[in-house]
Amino acid sequence: MKLPIYLDYSATTPVDPRVAQKMAECLLVDGNFGNPASRSHVFGWKAEEAVENGRRQVAELINADPREIVWTSGATESDNLALKGVAHFYQTKGKHIITSKIEHKAVLDTARQLEREGFEVTYLEPGEDGIVTPAMVEAALRDDTILVSLMHVNNEVGSINDIAAIGELTRSRGVLFHVDAAQSAGKVEIDVQKLKVDLMSFSAHKVYGPKGIGALYVSRKPRVRLEAIIHGGGHERGMRSGTLPTHQIVGMGEAFAIAKQEMAAENVRIKALSDRFFKQVSDLEELYVNGSQTARVPHNLNLSFNYVEGESLLMSLKDIAVSSGSACTSASLEPSYVLRALGRNDELAHSSIRFSFGRFTTEEEVDYAAQEVCKAVNKLRELSPLWDMYKDGVDISKIEWAAH
């Protein structure tokens, strides 16, 4: 076993060697390096063929028509294109958008920008299990609502929203529905024919593909119109200009093809690893599982260790790569906005760690990590006066701390 151990697969995944191999074939002078938009010679034709093959592979994972896949630089851009593209195109119809408080920053920050432009956004508060229900969405719908944007799987706590039920509701009301599927692709079965979804964002680097490439599914039936946010050449049917990076597209296609073949078996293996890890840490007192106990992906286990500061626990686990909060916000000292929205108090939010397991995680690594977590938590609690008070039966929440 090699140290350090990587248990932060929800932040990013390493590229699968099979994917890297395919990508390498599109880089050098004797490879498929042409510009897919070059229509006048074989180098361009071959590159275009590779791009269209990748498009088909992504479409097949989600049961879409390849013509419904638009290449982007990643899920952040896909989210931006979906929200801004719909808002700007349909603004004469209405200016109200619905999302939730626990979305990824790529959706929340885009929604804030649209508010500055005069759109009105309702931010739904999920249940403490991290799930947004169809009833919550229905209660927020108005005559001028043009878009609902919700994630499929939450990146911090792994809870799974009932996209099918929400899609039935939005479709029956004639409201467009965008889903951020960055954390669900390759983990949860997605069939856009069954899910009444109009737009769906994907990223390659969460599915053992390269960083810097993603896709947006844009439904053709019923047809969704978007206003582009990047101009210059009219690539991707005018929705997203810019020379297509053949090597990255080939990588994303291969990664999604592997996910389609191996997802079922991989989910069983990862659930076993996650259960194995949890069993070994579950004897710790004051341990809380964040998010839904039932509707969750096994890849993500977000735990709060009460009376332990999350940052100090991270420092103690120097040979284990995990995160507190999501990778995009964990540089700030604020407690996780997701956990706060689930009703966790500041202490529990600050004491949370996200463990995420993946394709290359082994039983040996999981056992070592669990053992180190138990050691670190017990050691940090020994140093904590609050832990002593808790053990003595003092209700810490009732203490009035004196200000200096």
From Swiss-Prot:
Pathway: Cofactor biosynthesis; iron-sulfur cluster biosynthesis. Gene3D superfamilies: Aspartate Aminotransferase, domain 1 (3.90.1150.10), Type I PLP-dependent aspartate aminotransferase-like (Major domain) (3.40.640.10). [2Fe-2S] cluster binds at residue 328. It comes from the Bacteria. Pyridoxal 5'-phosphate binds at residues 75-76, 155, 183, 203-205, 243. Pfam families: Aminotran_5. It catalyses: (sulfur carrier)-H + L-cysteine = (sulfur carrier)-SH + L-alanine. Keywords: 2Fe-2S, Cytoplasm, Iron, Iron-sulfur, Metal-binding, Pyridoxal phosphate, Transferase. GO terms for cellular component: L-cysteine desulfurase complex. The active site is at 328 (cysteine persulfide intermediate). It is found in: Cytoplasm. It is an enzyme of class 2 (transferase). Its EC number is 2.8.1.7. The modification N6-(pyridoxal phosphate)lysine is found at residue 206. Master enzyme that delivers sulfur to a number of partners involved in Fe-S cluster assembly, tRNA modification or cofactor biosynthesis. Catalyzes the removal of elemental sulfur atoms from cysteine to produce alanine. Functions as a sulfur delivery protein for Fe-S cluster synthesis onto IscU, an Fe-S scaffold assembly protein, as well as other S acceptor proteins. Homodimer. Forms a heterotetramer with IscU, interacts with other sulfur acceptors. This is Cysteine desulfurase IscS. It comes from Pseudomonas entomophila (strain L48). The lineage of its organism: Bacteria, Pseudomonadati, Pseudomonadota, Gammaproteobacteria, Pseudomonadales.
